[in-house]
């Protein structure tokens, strides 16, 4: 042992491929373009090949070795489908996605390769925490710090490091992304988190697993806590573990001990909730089996009604919309 050696701080210094932890940046970039993408927009999870001059073809496979055809955008994220994410990322533009990653707080060179979309980029756990902090705080980026001030022996401050906050994303697409990341926990790759936390503790998160299962990640946040877990070997050996089997249980145990506040997303003014018929993806009603309330940016929800939605549902919805408009008008008038 060398007493002068302070050890290796993996949280700060271990840069590792992040895998699917980068996918929220793809979906955030898409959701910001509400004219083209919503949480229910069909995304193709069929076989995908990316051709690049002077390089072998790149064809990502899904974790389950299957392709799933057209799936809603929120399902593609919840189930962490690689082909869907790669196709969507190249469709909207790799550079645009990387710009989103930078705005989330990653300050390091990134090459605009298609494989980068699926996390072929090395970040430290602290850098990942910076990304997810921006999402968790509603699009406000605040540089993470461990020191608030330096004081004298008597407690007089010598240097202060004040909190710096910058809004880098509109609240609406961030809200949609966070809602979709709750689906990751409710019904997606992180649903085993229910073994560690009671159902009333709402969580948003994302699993991550890299090639040959060398790195396992879980990033998640509640109403008052955000944590990142990485599991792997320093020598880059294959751990043969996934984000959901290795990193998630550690995250869950830790959060259970901390008794966190549930995540309660504050709905921005530019978001509306609409009942959607899951069979058709059209505007549904209470008479549609399994109709689900889905958030949309104002004006982006489907206008066509599903066959299962009768005239009574349409009338009720019209009344509700009128009441909501009147409420918004009164709030603006009286400043409440």
Write out the residue ranges for each language-model feature.
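Cysteine/selenocysteine-centered motifs that mediate thiol-based redox chemistry or coordinate metal-sulfur cofactors
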Residues: 28-32, 38-41, 269-274
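Mid-domain, small-residue-enriched loop/turn segments at the edges of structured enzyme/sensor domains
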Residues: 55-62, 92-130, 139, 143-146
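Low-complexity, Gly/Ser/Thr/Pro-rich intrinsically disordered linker/tail segments
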Residues: 274-336
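A penicillin-recognizing enzyme superfamily signal
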Residues: 1-14, 22, 75, 79, ...
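Short active-site loop at a secondary-structure junction
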Residues: 5-25, 39-42, 67-71, 115
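Conserved catalytic neighborhood of penicillin-recognizing serine enzymes
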Residues: 36-97, 113, 141, 152-183
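A generic secondary-structure signal for well-formed alpha-helical elements
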Residues: 29, 33-38, 50, 92, ...
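Thr-Gly-centered strand-to-loop micro-motif
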Residues: 87-88, 118, 205-207
């Amino acid at each position: 042992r060398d007493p002068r050696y302070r050890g290796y701080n993996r949280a700060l210094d271990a840069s590792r491929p992040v895998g699917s932890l980068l996918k929220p940046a793809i979906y955030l970039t898409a959701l910001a373009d509400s004219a083209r993408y919503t949480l229910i927009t069909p995304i193709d999870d069929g076989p995908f090949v990316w051709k690049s001059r002077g390089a072998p073809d790149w064809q990502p496979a899904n974790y389950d070795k299957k392709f799933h055809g057209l799936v809603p955008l929120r399902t593609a994220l919840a189930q962490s489908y690689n082909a869907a994410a790669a196709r969507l990322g190249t469709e909207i533009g790799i550079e645009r996605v990387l710009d989103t990653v930078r705005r989330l707080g990653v300050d390091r060179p990134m090459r605009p390769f298609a494989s980068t979309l699926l996390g072929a980029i090395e970040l430290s756990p602290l850098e990942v925490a910076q990304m997810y902090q921006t999402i968790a705080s509603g699009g406000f980026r605040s540089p993470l710090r461990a020191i608030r001030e330096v004081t004298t022996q008597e407690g007089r401050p010598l240097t202060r490091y004040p909190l710096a906050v910058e809004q880098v994303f509109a609240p609406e697409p961030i809200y949609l992304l966070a809602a979709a990341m709750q689906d990751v926990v409710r019904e997606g790759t992180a649903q085993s988190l229910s073994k560690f936390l009671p159902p009333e503790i709402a969580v948003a998160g994302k699993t991550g697993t890299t090639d040959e299962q060398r790195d396992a990640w879980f990033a998640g946040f509640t109403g008052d806590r955000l944590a990142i877990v990485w599991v792997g070997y320093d020598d880059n050996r294959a751990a043969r573990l996934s984000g959901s089997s290795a990193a998630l249980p550690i995250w869950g145990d830790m959060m259970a001990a901390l008794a966190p506040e549930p995540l309660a997303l504050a709905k921005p003014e530019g978001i509306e909730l609409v009942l959607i018929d899951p069979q058709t993806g059209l505007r549904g009603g209470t008479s549609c089996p399994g109709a689900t309330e889905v958030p949309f940016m104002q004006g982006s929800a489907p206008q066509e009604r599903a066959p299962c939605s009768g005239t009574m549902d349409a009338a009720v919805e019209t009344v509700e919309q009128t009441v909501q408009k009147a409420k918004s008008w009164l709030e603006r008038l009286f400043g409440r």
